[in-house]
Amino acid sequence: MARLTGRRGGGKSPSAGGGVQGLEPLTERLSNHKVTRLALSFLDANDGLHLKDLALETMADDRRASFDGHHFWNFGSDSFLGLDRHPRVHEAIRDALPEWGSHNGASRAFSSPLLTDEAEAKLAAWLGVSDTFIFPSVTLANVGLLPAIAGAGDLLIVDRESHDSVHQGARLAAAGGARLEQVPAPDPRVVADVIRRVDARGTVMAIDGVYSMSGKTPPLVELDATVRGLGGTLYVDDAHGTGVVGPRGRGAAAAALGTLDNILMVGSLSKAFSCLGAFVTCTADLKT
């Protein structure tokens, strides 16, 4: 295989008047972080090359990728169904651009584009739920939703193997007063013990529908029965199951539970749907 050269830069950036000095203490401090040290050790072991530093020059319909003039098969794409190359998708984009432009130009708190309302209704019909709400990404959904549904006096249980964005949202919820408990494995008995032990106003358990690193699925049926039986709500980040797992691709949660009426399920629009965004299932009252 031909060796690739990345776009990774080196050395100090010039700055008039020495303005870069204000960034040097920050750079030095961050360089000592354990995650940074791990990344740097990887780079040292691989001649300073990391995939994130490669500039993708072209992507063919058959997933051949071009980096630095070399061609490879791309097995790292998260466009699960290849819909980003589907002619009907391209046609819909071309038809919408003259009327709607490339950006809605406003917050959802100010107005909601008709196309967004239509998309949320179609997602709800596809999933068999009352309603859905679209977010810019799954990460933003998790960091926005978890602090909103688990506040002061509430218990938030998080599976340790859940996606990092779930943990980010959980930390924000904890900063807002929620009691945060991590469980090392999604064992319904352990979860039940935690709920019974903690005196909380309400309970939410956050977990992945499909673990992004292993592809495994947790015991959602047992967890839903346990959490709901003790007065709580199951919150499932099903980003990696949306569109590809279960009947009609409704995801791991729907495949396991049969219905999404009693849980909150976050799905991705950036993977199987090949666009950008996320959604959460909800009722009209929750959406309001």
Segment roles from a protein language model:
Residues 91-137:
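Conserved N-terminal alpha-helix of the aminotransferase class I/II PLP-enzyme fold
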